[in-house]
Amino acid sequence: MGDSSMNISVLGIDIAKNIFQLHGVDSSGKRILKQRIVREQLSAYVANFQLCTIAMESCVGANYWARVFQRQGHIVKLISPQFVKPFVKTNKNDANDAEAIVEASIRPSMHFVPVKQVEQQDIQSLHRVRSRLVKNRTALINEIRRLNLEYGITIPQGALKVKSHLRSVVDDKENELTISSRELMEELYDELVEFEERLKKIEKKVKLICKEND
């Protein structure tokens, strides 16, 4: 690392899965660093800088790196990608993106995205998984209702109603279900119960995290 790297005022980082592009400027806005670096070396590399402002787009992985750099003492600014795009001067590539991030970060009117701490990240992750489970459960419920209609069996809407009615359908030996279709409905019932149990676990975890951080 050259001496100029130690005088960086603002460092823009275009984050990726493996290769990161860095663009550093001094207090006058002059570029003094243009560097590509692999993920495994990024933290140690930036730790050698004098404390500066580090700007990144608020994309996947940004909150993790923001926390890493904050622990090193740097000031971190996250910017929504839509606000960085207007500052890309030429063709879009990693180097130009990193430069655009710096340009956007020094604008007085720029709005920044708060860095999520680990607990906030946990809650967001749980909510995302919960949303997916709810979507998949809804698809399962719709499939259960459609399949039963093929056997002349109507099941009302709503997760709780579908669950209780499907159990009754499986246990009812007088309906048109064959051994094969009854086994299928039993499997669908078990799948629905599993969704309910997973959703309850997630909701319990969210409440626990919120309680621990009150």
PLM segments and residue spans:
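A detector of single, family-specific signature residues
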Residues: 1-214
